[in-house]
Amino acid sequence: MAEEISDLHDVRNIGIMAHIDAGKTTTTERILFYTGKNYKIGETHDGASTMDFMAQEQERGITIQSAATTCFWSRQSHDTKDKFQINIIDTPGHVDFTAEVERSLRVLDGAVAVFDGKEGVEPQSETVWRQADKYGVPRICFINKMDKLGANFYYSVDTIKEKLGATPIVMQLPIGSENDFTGVVDLVEMQAYVWNGTEELGAKYDTTEIPDDLKDKAQEYHEKLVEAAAEADDDLMNKFFEDGDLSKEDIRAGVRKLTIAKEAFPIFCGSAFKDKGVQPMLDGVVDYLPSPEDVPAIKGYKPGDESVEIDRHPVKSDPFAALVFKISTHPFYGKLVFVRVYSGSVVPGDSVLDSTREKKERIGKIFQMHADKENPMDRADAGNIYTFVGLKNVTTGDTLCAIDDPITLDSMTFPDPVIQVAVEPKTKADQEKMGIALSKLAEEDPTFQVTTDEESGQTLIAGMGELQLDIIVDRMRREFKVECNQGKPQVAYRETIRKAVMDQGYTHKKQTGGSGQFAKVLMNFEPLDTTEGKTFEFENKVTGGHISAEFIGPIEAGVKEAMESGVLAGFPVVGVKATVTDGQMHPVDSSEMAFKLAGSMCFKEAAPKAKPVILEPIMKVEVRTPEEYMGEVIGDLNQRRGNIQSMTDGVGVKVIDAKVPLSEMFGYIGDLRSKTQGRAMFTMEMDSYDEVPKSVSEEIIKAQRGE
C-alpha cells in the first residue's frame, strides 16, 4: 500500500498554476525529483515530463489535463525533522483548458502561482488568479526563469501588485540574474543559498553569508518583511513595538496567518529548469500554505432542502463526505473518479450515496495517483485526494456521502462552450464507435458538449476553443480508433413573417374516379411575439359546423409541416399565429389528408405576401480586456455588426458587453487574442433571434440557392 501521513496538520493539498510557458510543469518535475518521487527528471521540451503523460501533451509541450500526485518533504532551511505529505495537482495554462483549472482549485487548500521572471503577470496568470480568488485559495508565488535574458525579479513583483491587486510579501531576493543567477537570499534566516553546479541537478546547495553587494538591500527587505508579519495580529504587533524586531518563528507565524487569510502572498524565486530555488520554495509550501485543518469546515446542505445547512469537519469521526472533481477513462479500470474527501473515511467495498443523483454507488478500489500510475490504498481518509474505481453513474461536481448522513456540497460551474465544429465519421464502422467515444470524452470534460443539429443531422462538438476541439478529435483517433472529418457548422438561421395576411383561402379538390378529395379553408396568418419562447400558435374560430372538429387537427399539422421550410431560403419558420376562420367540407370526399394538404398550401400561398424575413441567432458577448486594447476591441465588434450594450470597469480590466450575430463570431477567439496579445478573454451565450439586414439576407439566399 502507498505511504500516507495520518496527522492532517502535516498534509498540504496544492495546485501548481500559471500562464502557459511560465515553467509550471518543469517546476512540478523538480518538486517530484527533490522529494524523491521521481529518480530522474523528465523535461517538458523533450516530451518526457511525468505529469504530462497524454500523447498530445508530450507532443505539444503543454499541459491539457490536470494530473495528480503525492510526494513527501522535510524542510531544509529550518526545523528539518517533520515530514510533510504534499498532494499536488498540475493544471493547464492554456485558455482553452480553464475548466481543468477551475475544478482543481475547487478542491485544493492552497496553490503555487508560477510566473515568468521576465514577463511577470501574463493574461492567463490573471485568469487563474481570479479563479483562485473565486474559490478562496491561499497562494504563494514562485517567480521562475530568473536565468532568462531580461528576467527582472522586482518588475515581476510590481506586476503582481498592479495587475492582480495583490499584496506581495518578498521572502527572498535573487542573487544575480540571467546567466549570472546563482541562488537566493532567505530574508527570514538572513542567509544565502547558492547552487554552485557541482552537485548534479541542484539536489544540494551551499548555505553561505549574504553577498556584500546585497547586504543593504537584504536588510531593507528583511525590515519590510518583519513589518508585514507584525500586521498579522495584535500580539505580533506588540512584540514588534517592544523589541523593534520579531523572531524567525514569529515572522513565519505572521506570514502564515496573512497567507491563509489571503491578505498577502509570499514571493519566492528561482529557475526550475536550471535546478535552482525549488527546495526553499517547497519549504514555503509547508510553512505558509494551509493544512486541511486550517481551512474552515466544508459547508453543504440537506439533499432536497437548501435551507438546511450542514457542516463537515476534516476528521474521521464525522460522516463521510467527498466531492468528485474529475473523471477520466482508464484502459483497464474504466472510469476513474477523482475525489477530495472532506470528512469521514471509506474502504474498498463500501457503499456510498451520490446525493446529487440520489443513487447508491459501491467503491471497488481506492488509489492515490502519480500522474498515470495507480498506487493502491486500503482506505480514504478526510483531508486527502484519492481516485475511486467502480462507480458507475457519477460525474464531475457530484457529492459522495454516507448513506445514513446525506449531504450535498456546492458543485462547480463551468462556462458554456464558445466554438463548435461539425464532425462526421469516415466509415460506417467509425459511425458506430463515434457516439461511444464522444459520450466518454464529454463525461471527462464539463466544457465539451455534443449535440445533433436537427436541420442538418450533423453531429456538432462544442468547446472553449479550437485547440481543445483539435485535441478531442485527436483523442478519438488515438484512444478510440475513430476516424472523422471536421468541418464548419452552418449558422442555424430561421424565417418569420412581419405582416398579417387575412382571409387567405385555399381549396383542395381532386376527382379521379371513385371517392375524390375535397377540403376548403379560410385562414388568417399574423406575426407572433417569440420573446417568451413561443414560436407558433394555432386557433380555431370556425362556427356553424362548416368544418368538422376531426379536421381541425390536420389543418394545424399541415401548417406546421409547411413551416418547416420557409419561402425565402428554406429555413424553418417561427413566430406565426395561424387562425382558421371558415371553410367547407364534402360529406364523402373530405378526409384528414385533404385538410392537411389544404392547411399546408394555404400557408405556402400566404407566406410570400406576409413580408417574410430571415432571422439570425444573436449572441450575448462579454469581452474582458486591458484598457489599452479597448478601442481596437470595440472597433472590431462594430465591424462584426455588434451592438455595444455597456462598458464597465472590472478588476484591472475593462468589461465590454455587446450583442453580436453568431455568424460574425467564427474565428473571433483567434482574432481577439492576436489583437490583444492574448490578454483579453471573452464568453458568449445565445441571446435571441433578430432580423438579418437586407444585404446580408440577399447573400444568405444566394448561398442557399447555390447561386
From Swiss-Prot:
GO biological process, one term: ribosome disassembly
Residue intervals of the tr-type G domain: 9-293
HAMAP family, A to Z: EF_G_EF_2_B
Subcellular location: Cytoplasm
PROSITE patterns reported in the protein's UniProt record: G_TR_1, G_TR_2
Protein name in UniProt: Elongation factor G
GO molecular function, one term: GTPase activity
